[in-house]
Structures are given as structure tokens and as C-alpha cells.
Regions:
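N-terminal amphipathic/basic leader segments beginning at the initiator methionine
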Residues: 1-29, 318, 326-337
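Short glycine-rich or small-residue beta-strand-to-loop segments that form or flank ligand, phosphate
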Residues: 27-34, 50-53, 79-88, 95-98, ...
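Glycine-rich oxoanion-binding loops at beta->alpha junctions
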Residues: 46-77
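Short, acidic/small-residue loops that bind anionic groups at enzyme active sites
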Residues: 53-58, 102-124, 289-291
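Short Gly/Thr/Asp-enriched flexible loops that form oxyanion-binding sites at enzyme active sites
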Residues: 91-105, 124, 273-279
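Internal, active-site/partner-interface "lid" segment
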Residues: 120-128, 138-204
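Glycine-rich phosphate/diphosphate-binding loops and the adjacent beta-loop-alpha structural elements
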Residues: 182-274
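C-terminal non-catalytic interaction/assembly regions of soluble proteins
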Residues: 242-337
Length: 337
């Protein structure tokens, strides 16, 4: 097996988990979703990120029994945080798994990631989709868990990362789910889809191909000019022992903010092209008074062979910067050790 010093594989049900799990005195972090987006999530299991990742079939949510069994194996007694992308199947199944785990005496909190500014509702979601901020939340919260954050403090940090992150993507070609044997959608050779979802969901607008600089400007300005997004989400209240509705509002990006810039390949775009996007993004951020203090560039959330990219901007404070810089050792992301 690849990376035997970092991860183990559990079959029936399927999930990947840390070789040293459970880690004594540490809150465990579990995430997951449909396959086809590698290295997310399995490539981010290891020191400083996830304790376990649960893969579904291609573009299909994992089932509750996967998350339940993963939680049981990685739980050290300090509780488990589920980081959940906002897709209807993921939300439903992670919620069910959390309820099942609580019945077995495991403390579990779920935090939703809903950072895609392209559309409010889509084929797979109610509300905004969870995309690029997911990886950033897994890294930052993973480091905080290693530092000894308790479950409630870790959930609050994850929620803070989510509301401060915004993403948007573009597709130049479709992707082909193996079981379907045909492209998820059709695009002309001279067309692109702005605001595409990671499963090929329709975006904000289809238009003629533009230059890399023009595409970057479309994405970046959509993110930067996104203001006061409010929504109601459901979270577990440990005091009341029930699911409750809470109101969230994303703070607006403003002059002087420090941000992490994440330029991501959708899978079919070569890494040599991504710095072109980053160069223009850096220029736009400078003009808007945003200071890029950290960056991540590469194929971290893919959509099979789709050609395209996405941009994520995360407004950072000192706490997030500290945990972003902290050591990490996973198959898909590592530094500092």
C-alpha cells in the first residue's frame, strides 16, 4: 500500500485513517465525500490534518456506516469533528452518522463548508456548495487539534474558517464519470462555464473562451465583491442535546485584509498554467488592498479530468496563520517535518 507510514485502509466499510490513531488526548477530525476529487480527502489524512477520510463512489456521498466506523476507530475519547461539504447527500449522511455515534457515547460536532460564491442553490445543494475552503479548514483545524484544542473550540475555529473563505471555479471541458461513460455536460471548443461545480453542476454563466487574465479577473472579482452572505444552517447543540438552526453571515473582504490565495487545478489543467492565474490574482488583490500573506497552488480538489481551475480567498487572522504554518505530513500536503 502507498504511504504505509502515514495511513491505513479499512474495508467494509471503506475509509482511510492515520496509522497512529487514535491519538491520545486529541480531538479527531473526519471528513469525506465522493471519489473523483483526489487528493481530497484521502490525501489529507495524517499528522496535522485529518484522522480519517471516508470515500464514496465517484461523485457519490459516503454512507453513514463509513463515518460511524471511522469515528469509532479514531476517537481517543476527546470527541470527533466532522467537516462536511455542503452537498445534500454529504450533509444528510454525516448528520445520520453523528446521531449514530452519539448513541454509542461519542461526542460529535458537524461543521458545514459552504464557500462557493457562484450560485445559491444547485443540483446537489441547498445553499452554496462546499469547495476550496474545505482543504484550508482541514489543514488549519488539523493543526489546532494537534495543539490540543477541545471539540467546541475546534468547531468554532472551523466555522470561522468557513465564513471567511470564498471560492469560485471555471471549466473549459467537462469530466466523464466512469459509470456513465459520457461527459457530464457539453461545452463547445470555444466555450467555458464560469462558476462550475466540482461535480460538473451548472455554473453562473456560459460564455466564449477568454484569456487567462480575463478568466482570473472574472473569478477574483466575483469573490472579492461578494458581500453579506447570510444563511441559516443546522448544527448540534450539546447543551440542548438537539439540532438547532443558527444564522451565519460572511464578513466582507475589505482594504487591508490579509488573505491566503488558493489557486486549484480541476484535474486536467497542467500545473505550469496555474502560476499564470496566480500572477493575475496577486495583481488584482494588490489593487483592491488585499495582502496575500500565504498561498497554495496546485491540484488539490479535482474533478476527474476536467480542464479548469478554481480560486479561493481566505481572510486570515493570527490564529489561522499560526495553524496554517504548522507542520503537516500527509500524502497530498506536507511541510515543516
Amino acid at each position: 500500500m502507498a504511504y504505509p507510514d502515514i495511513v491505513k485502509v479499512h474495508f467494509d466499510p471503506n475509509f482511510i485513517y492515520r496509522t497512529d490513531a487514535p491519538v491520545k488526548g486529541k480531538v479527531a477530525i473526519v471528513s469525506g465525500g465522493g471519489s473523483g476529487h483526489e487528493p481530497m480527502h484521502g490525501g489529507f489524512v495524517g499528522f496535522g490534518m485529518l484522522d480519517a477520510a471516508c470515500p464514496g463512489e465517484v461523485f457519490t456521498s459516503p454512507t453513514p456506516d463509513q463515518m460511524l466506523e471511522a469515528a469509532k476507530i479514531v476517537n481517543s475519547g476527546e470527541g470527533v469533528l466532522f467537516i462536511v461539504k455542503n452537498y445534500s447527500g454529504d450533509v444528510m449522511n454525516f448528520d445520520m452518522a453523528a446521531d449514530m455515534a452519539r448513541e454509542e457515547g461519542i461526542r460529535v460536532l458537524n461543521i458545514l463548508i459552504d464557500d462557493d460564491v457562484a450560485v445559491k442553490d444547485s443540483l446537489y445543494t441547498q445553499g452554496r456548495r462546499g469547495v476550496g475552503t474545505t482543504v484550508l479548514a482541514e489543514k488549519i483545524c488539523g493543526a489546532a487539534a494537534e495543539r490540543g484544542y477541545d471539540l467546541e473550540k475546534l468547531a468554532n475555529l472551523c466555522r470561522k474558517v468557513n465564513i471567511n473563505g470564498r471560492s469560485m471555479g471555471v471549466a473549459l471541458t467537462s469530466c466523464t464519470v466512469p459509470s456513465a461513460g459520457k461527459p457530464t455536460f457539453e461545452l463547445g471548443e470555444d466555450e467555458m462555464e464560469i462558476g462550475i461545480g466540482i461535480h460538473g453542476e451548472p455554473g453562473r454563466k456560459r460564455m466564449k473562451l477568454k484569456t487567462a487574465d480575463e478568466i482570473t479577473e472574472l473569478l477574483a472579482l466575483s469573490i472579492i465583491e461578494d458581500i453579506f452572505y447570510k444563511r441559516t444552517i443546522r448544527e448540534w447543540d450539546e447543551g440542548k442535546r438537539e439540532w438547532v438552526d443558527i444564522e451565519l453571515e460572511d464578513p466582507t473582504l475589505k482594504h487591508g485584509d490579509k488573505v491566503l490565495a488558493f489557486v486549484n487545478s480541476m484535474g486536467g489543467t497542467a500545473s505550469i498554467e496555474l502560476p499564470i492565474v496566480y500572477r493575475k490574482l496577486h495583481e488584482i488583490c494588490e489593487k483592491r488592498g488585499l495582502k496575500i500573506i500565504r498561498n497554495l497552488i496546485g491540484p488539490y480538489i479535482t474533478s476527474l479530468e476536467m480542464q479548469g481551475c478554481s480560486i479561493t480567498l481566505l481572510k486570515m487572522d493570527d490564529e489561522m496563520i499560526e495553524f496554517w504554518d504548522a507542520p503537516v505530513k500527509t500524502a497530498g500536503l506536507r511541510w515543516g517535518m
